[in-house]
From Swiss-Prot:
Keyword S-adenosyl-L-methionine among UniProt keywords: no
Source species taxonomy: Bacteria, Bacillati, Cyanobacteriota, Cyanophyceae, Oscillatoriophycideae
Keywords noted in UniProt: Ribonucleoprotein, Ribosomal protein
Protein name listed in UniProt: Large ribosomal subunit protein bL33
Keyword Disulfide bond found: no
Superkingdom, natural source: Bacteria
One Gene Ontology CC term in the entry: cytoplasm
GO biological process: translation
Short name of one Pfam family: Ribosomal_L33
Length: 64
């Protein structure tokens, strides 16, 4: 018998300013992993997190 997938998904959050900002502290793109509830949050997740490459708090969006 196969079990159903859970409601929670593991997602990746990526900094939105790292791609377009040439004046950042170091090369690369900041990424965080977290989980979200598929039933409660159906859309893409956006959180303000600290970006180590930009050296400030920026908006991180969910990528697939």
């Amino acid at each position: 018998m196969a079990s159903k997938k859970g409601v929670r998904l593991i997602i990746t959050l990526e900094c939105t300013e790292c791609r377009s900002n040439p004046d950042k502290r170091s090369a690369g793109v900041s990424r965080y992993t977290t989980s979200k509830n598929r039933r409660n949050t159906t859309g893409r997740l956006e959180l303000k997190k600290f970006c180590t490459h930009c050296n400030k708090h920026t908006v991180h969006k969910e990528i697939k």
